Amino acid sequence: MPLVYSYNSNKGRKEKNEDAIAVMKNKQGEVLAVVCDGVGSHSNAAYSSNYIVTTLEKEWQNLTFANFNNMKNWLCDKIEKLNLELFNKSQEKNKKMGTTIVTVATFDNQVVVYNIGDSSAYGLTKDNEISVVTVEDSFVGALISAGAITQEEAKTHPERHVLTQALATRDNINLHTFIDDLSKYDYFLLCSDGLTNMIENEEIQDIVRNNELSISVEKLIELCVNRGGVDNISVAIIKNLGGVNHD
C-alpha cells in the first residue's frame, strides 16, 4: 500500500527536547514510524528515547519480511529486547532511564501499532472518523478506563503525567497491540503527549485533512506552542495514497 509521510519535533518551552522521532522505509518500501518521549523525571530520559529510535531506524532500513506476521513479531521482539537492554544498563550504571514508545508499522494492506506509556497514535478513517488506537499507560488513563473521570478532566488532573508503564523501567513490559486493515485509513498520526494534552481530536482531523502533510505537522506543533507549549511536541503523519508510491 503506497504511503507518504512527514514528521517533526519541537522542544516547546522546555530547556531541551527529550522526545525522539523518525519515520523510515525498509528495503521493501514498508513504513515504520516511531515516537519516544523520554521520562522527564529520569536523568537519562533523552538518551533512552534517542537510543530506541536510532536503533529501530538503523535496523528497519536493512530488513525484508516474508509476511505481516513475520514483521510484527520482529518489531514486538525488538521492542522487548530494547527494553531489557536499557533496563539492564540502568541497573549496571545505577542511572535511571525511561521512555514511552508508540510505533506504526505496515506490511502490504495491514498495519500494526505498538505502544507503552502515554504517547499516542490516531487513525483517521475513510469514513471521516478519528480515533485513538493506543492504550494510555498512565494514572489518568486508568481513571478514564474505569469511568472515574472524562477525557477533558484528565487534561487538567494534577497527576496526569504519572505513568504506570514505560520502557527501561522494569525487565518485563505489557506491550499494547492494535492490528487492522490499512485500507480503512487515510492517515495515521503519532505524537508525544505534548500534542495530545493541548489539542482536540476535531482540530487534528481538520488540520490533517485540509493541508499538505508537512504543513499539517507544522500547524499542529505551532498550535500547541501558541497554547503554552509546556512540553516537547513531536508529530508524525502517515498518509495512505492508494496509488503509486512516492517518497
Where are these regions (language model features)?
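PP2C/PPM-type serine/threonine phosphatase catalytic domain
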Residues: 1-247
